[in-house]
Amino acid sequence: MNSRRKFVGALLAGAVAVGAAWATPALSADQVIRVGTLKLIHGITPFFYERFTPAGYKFEIVTFDTPTDGKNAVVTRSVDFGTYGLAAATLGGAAGEPVVIIGAQCNRGMAVVAGAKSAINSIKDLAGKKVAILPGSTQEVVILDRLKMEGMSIKDIQPIRVSFSDMPAALERGDIDAYVGAEPGPSISVAKGVGKIVEFPYSTPTGSVNMVMTTHQAMLKDNPDLVKTFLAMHRKATEYAMGNRGAFIDMAMQKLGQPRPTIEIAAPNVELTWNTDADWVTRAKYYGSQMLEMKQIRQLPDYSSFINTSFVAEVARLK
């Protein structure tokens, strides 16, 4: 009888030990937050998150080549949060996809570039020229709006689909006459002596609004505390990067694989940001109206749910 008690006791002790062995890692494991961003200098903020990550969390940063890929990752919940252009987000929202803008990522970061020795010195000079544009990008709507301001339309140029990363090389080869690009592309062309800036296209009512921070609609309901925690880190990382130009340039060089001269040219054309104030929302809605007018979307997103400023407003009140 005594030996039986010892056997049962040993068995129970073993079970407790095994349970503890399994339980300890589960209790101590950090929650992984997956964030998608683009391979652009103005998408660099997520790489600074680690510096401001509170205990119990860690980040996994996933990079995408196109805004649409970034948006789709949010829709499919492959990432928890994702930053990409306003255009891709608006396309998703207008199509009824469960994507919500919860903050901003950057302003500026775009430029119209032409061959350094070309006679293209203004938007009007693009008439009849081969111009690289990435469909579905924020730049696409901006350049169409700029053409309209000059009394022109897409029919007055020869639009060619080229990804942002391929634009500098296409210009250097002579495949195109100009492009509407995203940093560091324009600065690569300038630094190599291949291209020149025709203009920074920020004179439309859209202004310099560019990339947004988004999440899946379900995240707002299922884990609002995580959204607040994330946006607080996003704000801190943004303000740190903008306030420490050296760290900003070093990180961009490391993650984008570009030399210092190129990044130093690009940096002044990038404004990392996080807040979506009333002026920002007005510009974003104007941008959506242009997409509708240009028949890029069939209807406007439901802005009452597509842009949620409540979380970023709470973060704005933090010191």
Show where each model-derived region lies.
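Phosphate-coordinating loops and pocket residues in cytosolic domains that bind phosphorylated ligands
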Residues: 9, 128, 191, 308
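Conserved C-terminal helix/tail region of periplasmic/extracytoplasmic solute-binding proteins
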Residues: 292-319
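Secondary-structure end/capping motifs
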Residues: 222-298
